[in-house]
Every structure is written in structure tokens, then in C-alpha cells.
Amino acid sequence: MEQEKQAQIEQAVTTILEAVGEDTQRAGLIDTPKRVAKMYAEVFSGLTEPEFDDYKLFDSLNEGEMVLVKDIAFYSMCEHHLLPFYGKVHVAYLPEGGKVLGLSKLPRLVEHCAKRPTVQEDLTVTIARKLQENIPVKGIAVAIEAEHMCMTMRGVKTPQSSTKTFQFTGLFKEQEWKNQFLMEIR
């Protein structure tokens, strides 16, 4: 992160702490603005990194049978409250043209898309769209199950509640494929 931007974040954190009545000079808070700026550089790195473009394909005998990577752990920040939400992403696709994506690319794509302020619904759609646009597929299915700190810590205060979102494209819009995906991620 640029020094100027880091300084802006540090000043903003100091202002917030002062506004809520904290003594920003007490021992436990002196370096907090620096720590928060460093943390934001990490958790929002998807905003400053180049667009994810590592869609390495391999030849495969698989022609149209589901490839599923499930339980991809992730965290992101809710764009409404700047509080974390975290959970698991399940991504499946139906290969086309005898090509499959390198398996490590799916968790890397999820991480890249999640490292920015967003909402779970948009994150789900973004992952599906990026895959649909960049690899030859007959369909994509993405499911995310997450706990939102904006629901746990504030507002309705519902600890351990989970939110599930889904996005289906191509053949996964057909009930047979959709059902198979949903059964596999249970």
C-alpha cells in the first residue's frame, strides 16, 4: 500500500477512536492505527492486485462430467458495515472441449474475489461470471455458506446463523445438474 494511503487510513482510524471516546495515546492503542492500515492492505488486496488471470487449462478425458472443489475456506468484508463474513465456497463446472482448470486456480480465484468490500450475493455471482468468461464450460455452479459478523455482533445478534447463496449457469440451471451439485455439497 502506498505510504500516502496508509497515512490516510491511520488518520481515519485515529479519528474514529477519538470520536467513540477512546484515548488514542494509551499503551494498547498507540500503534492501532498502523496495525489497522496494514490489515486493510491485506484484507482489501483484491482492490490493488492485478485482475486474476491464471486460468491454466490442462487436457483431459473428462468431457462434461462435473468437477467440484468444495469447502474452500474464505473471508471477506461486508461493504455495508466493514465487518468480516467468512465461511466456505463450493465451485463446480462442467468441462467442455477436453480442457479442465488446474485445481488450485479455484481457491486462488475465490481468495482474489473475496479480498475487497463486497456482499455475499455479489461475491457468488462474481466467482461464477469470472469462470464462465475465462474457461470453456457447459455450466458453472457456485454456492457460498457464510457467517456474517454484521448479524452476529450487531443488529439482530444471531450468532452462528449462516447465509447461503447460489449461482448457476448453463447446464447447472437444469434441475438434474442442480440437484447433483446440491447433493454433493451437503
UniProtKB/Swiss-Prot annotation:
Catalytic activity, as annotated: GTP + H2O = 7,8-dihydroneopterin 3'-triphosphate + formate + H(+)
GO biological process, one term: one-carbon metabolic process
SUPFAM superfamilies per UniProt: Tetrahydrobiopterin biosynthesis enzymes-like (SSF55620)
Superkingdom: Bacteria
A GO term, aspect molecular function: GTP binding
Alphabetical list of Pfam families matching this protein: GTP_cyclohydroI (PF01227)
Keywords: GTP-binding, Hydrolase, Metal-binding, Nucleotide-binding, One-carbon metabolism, Zinc
Enzyme class: hydrolase
PROSITE patterns cross-referenced by the UniProt entry: GTP_CYCLOHYDROL_1_1
Pathway the protein takes part in: Cofactor biosynthesis; 7,8-dihydroneopterin triphosphate biosynthesis; 7,8-dihydroneopterin triphosphate from GTP: step 1/1
Annotated binding of Zn(2+), by residue: C78, H81, C150
Database matches in Gene3D superfamilies: 1.10.286.10, 3.30.1130.10
GO cellular component, one term: cytoplasm
Quaternary structure, from the entry: Toroid-shaped homodecamer, composed of two pentamers of five dimers.
Protein family according to the UniProt entry: Belongs to the GTP cyclohydrolase I family.
The name this protein goes by in its record: GTP cyclohydrolase 1
Gene field: folE
